[in-house]
Design a protein with these regions (language model features):
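Bacterial Sec-dependent signal peptides at the C-terminal "C-region" and cleavage site
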Residues: 10-16, 20-34
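Short, solvent-exposed loop/turn elements at domain surfaces
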Residues: 45-50, 83-85, 294-295
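Alpha-helical cap/lid subdomain in secreted, periplasmic
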Residues: 2-3, 90-255, 259, 263-270
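N-terminal post-signal-peptidase region of extra-cytosolic proteins
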Residues: 56, 83-94, 319-320
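N-terminal secretory signal peptides that target proteins for export/translocation
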Residues: 1-9
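N-terminal extracellular ligand-recognition/capping segment immediately after the signal peptide
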Residues: 290-299, 309-344
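Serine-esterase "nucleophile elbow" of acetyl-processing enzymes
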Residues: 30-77, 93-105
Length: 344
């Protein structure tokens, strides 16, 4: 009797382990079937620290919101990196190791290649083009599909271009010691040939190209001097709790700006690569605890949806377990639970 009881207990212990192993294998196999969009680049695209309510986001951090669960966005962009330093730090090797045939690699550099530091600097027409071409070539060698993008614009309406040897320093610049210069009505380019070189490389190597510089130029110019500040980490003292002294940062995006730019680039990707159109995801609001969405709490998302009380609103939920909200029977809100997202 004791022997049978021990066998039964052992079976009850092993069954959940077998089930867990099966689920892990199934999940891994399912992930292998998905197409991945890798992103390599700088701080304008990078994932950010979201602790303490920090508002800075890269457009690559928000890109998953605009593609369904058949596409996995794997963002490797890092603050302060150029096409040279990203490669020399071994970050490209990590992307290659994960790449499988049919995956896409978005290659976007330029902001830091123009900086004078030797570990970052490259020259358009020579070393910058060489690095871009190397990423293209090695992506193809591993069965991937390269997509070249030029750099997004800086919000630069200044009558003369302010001196800027490192965009990363902008995070420690408060509003009171920020740039105090007269702004005009026209957005002024700060990238020169660094915005031209990616298109030239794309033409020479027959690579997909998205003109992120022109798209964001038209966006910021269309918004104008004041409204364009809403895209960036531009806050007056006391306006944003995470930067109590304020900030004047014309390079890096806040949550709203990252989503606006990611939406533009997702649409441009689908136009350039029609195969991606069937995976394009459209939702009014995204909530995600990892900071990829418009909001990090369900309460914030619902509050924003209720502002549009007479319009239907779709809230997509990116992963995690959530308490089901109590809503009126005739609510205007529809939820879309993405992969891994469940109600308690």
């Amino acid at each position: 009797m004791e022997k049978k009881w021990n066998q039964l207990l052992r079976g009850n212990v092993l069954l959940p382990l077998y089930l867990l192993a099966f689920l892990l294998l199934f999940s891994a196999a399912n992930d292998e079937k998905k197409t991945t969009i890798f992103i390599i680049g700088d701080s304008t695209a990078a994932n950010k620290d979201i602790s303490g309510g920090k508002q800075e986001r890269g457009w690559g951090m928000a890109l998953q919101c605009f593609f369904d669960d058949n596409i996995r966005v794997d963002n490797h962009a890092v603050n302060g990196r150029s096409s040279l330093s990203f490669f020399n730090e071994g970050r490209w090797t990590k992307v290659i190791e994960k790449m499988k045939p049919g995956d896409y690699v978005i290659i976007q550099f330029g902001h830091n290649d123009e900086k004078p530091k030797a570990d970052r600097h490259t020259d358009p027409g020579s070393t910058f083009d060489y690095m871009l071409a190397r990423y293209v070539r090695e992506t193809r060698e591993h069965g991937g599909i390269p997509v070249l993008m030029n750099c997004v614009v800086r919000r630069n309406f200044f009558m003369s271009v302010p001196e800027n040897d490192d965009d990363e320093k902008l995070r420690t610049t408060t509003y009171k010691d920020g740039v105090k210069m007269v702004e005009g009505d026209s957005l002024i380019d700060t990238h020169g040939l660094y915005r031209i070189a990616p298109r030239d490389v794309a033409d020479r190597m027959n690579v997909h190209f998205v003109d992120a510089n022109q798209l964001t130029h038209d966006l910021e110019q269309g918004l104008g001097t004041e409204a364009s500040k809403k895209l960036h980490m531009w806050y007056r003292p006391g306006e944003e709790p995470s930067v109590p002294d304020g900030r004047q940062d014309n390079t890096h995006y806040n949550i709203y700006g990252a989503h606006v730019v990611a939406r533009l680039l997702a649409d441009a990707l689908c136009e350039e690569i029609p195969l991606l159109k069937k995976y394009r995801c459209v939702a009014d609001i995204t909530v995600d605890r990892q900071g990829r969405g418009d909001f990090m709490t369900m309460e914030q998302a619902i509050e924003a949806a209720q502002v549009k009380a007479k319009q239907p609103v779709t809230i997509q939920v990116l992963g995690g377990e959530w308490k089901r909200p109590s809503l009126p029977k005739k609510s205007n809100i529809t939820f879309v639970m993405r992969e891994g997202a469940t109600w308690k």
